[in-house]
Amino acid sequence: MPELPEVETSLRGVEPYLHGKIIKQIVVRTQKLRWAISDELQHMQGAKIVALSRRAKYLILHTTQGDILIHLGMSGSLGILQENQQPAGKHDHVDLITQDGTVLRYNDPRKFGCWLWTKNAEQHELITRLGPEPLSESFTAAYLFARSRNKTVAVKNFIMNNDIVVGVGNIYACESLFMAGLHPELAAQNLTEKQCERLVKVIKEVLAKAIIQGGTTLKDFIQPDGKPGYFAQVLQVYGRKDEACNDCGTIIEAKVIGQRNSYFCPHCQMLPR
């Protein structure tokens, strides 16, 4: 699933081609993804794209006729091409075409993403309930420690909760907990202030490095230029079950936590008794 670094990579990849452009047409080939595609999208001819931004895993196109919320879902990706350059494929569900012939193409084999229109993205219900951005100054050790009090949930599930902090998906939660030396099943309420300080620090580091590497490509995700994300080459625990830990040589284990596969080193990430 594309996570925060993949969406940020997509944003940085498409922004130079779309900022300031006028929408000529939005071609919708599939009426329903995760939700029905907003009818308003097909009536945005003449709208100017005045800005592009990201909030959590949502890419937002801000236009003179409202905002477009895009979520990549489980398998979505965005590409830039020229009009009539390449016929749409089976999984190419939406094309946003600008007046100069630039095409933003949305590909999504599993159709779990979304394209929604809203008057103001900041006031949309999908956005207003979100927690702080992990790379922002508001995501601090003091904040995380305060939110973790009386939370019996596993720390991995805790940091993946978008109400707590956005964008820390399964891959980056596993990697961050390894870097912090924390077992994924540790109860959030048992985190110390020092552990929260370390965890916040490594979450920021892991996500920043992943963005530099263009995200992580495991199966479907590609960058807008067609290249894969290269962070997969430096994963320490995720997807490495039965392989040796790079730090201590102990065999990496996997366990389902919160309905997701979780990877950890039982030596570097001991669970306190």
Swiss-Prot record:
The keyword DNA-binding applies. InterPro entries: DNA_glyclase/AP_lyase_DNA-bd, DNA_glyclase_Znf_dom_DNA_BS, Formamido-pyr_DNA_Glyclase, FPG_cat, MutM-like_N-ter, Ribosomal_uS13-like_H2TH, Znf_DNA_glyclase/AP_lyase, Znf_FPG/IleRS. A zinc finger (FPG-type) spans 236-270. The keyword Zinc applies. Its cofactor is Zn(2+). PROSITE patterns: FPG_CAT, ZF_FPG_1, ZF_FPG_2. GO terms for molecular function: 8-oxo-7,8-dihydroguanine DNA N-glycosylase activity; class I DNA-(apurinic or apyrimidinic site) endonuclease activity; damaged DNA binding; zinc ion binding. Its EC number is 3.2.2.23, 4.2.99.18. The active site is at P2, E3, K57, R260. DNA binds at H91, R110, K151. It catalyses: Hydrolysis of DNA containing ring-opened 7-methylguanine residues, releasing 2,6-diamino-4-hydroxy-5-(N-methyl)formamidopyrimidine; 2'-deoxyribonucleotide-(2'-deoxyribose 5'-phosphate)-2'-deoxyribonucleotide-DNA = a 3'-end 2'-deoxyribonucleotide-(2,3-dehydro-2,3-deoxyribose 5'-phosphate)-DNA + a 5'-end 5'-phospho-2'-deoxyribonucleoside-DNA + H(+). Involved in base excision repair of DNA damaged by oxidation or by mutagenic agents. Acts as a DNA glycosylase that recognizes and removes damaged bases. Has a preference for oxidized purines, such as 7,8-dihydro-8-oxoguanine (8-oxoG). Has AP (apurinic/apyrimidinic) lyase activity and introduces nicks in the DNA strand. Cleaves the DNA backbone by beta-delta elimination to generate a single-strand break at the site of the removed base with both 3'- and 5'-phosphates. Monomer. Belongs to the FPG family. This is Formamidopyrimidine-DNA glycosylase.
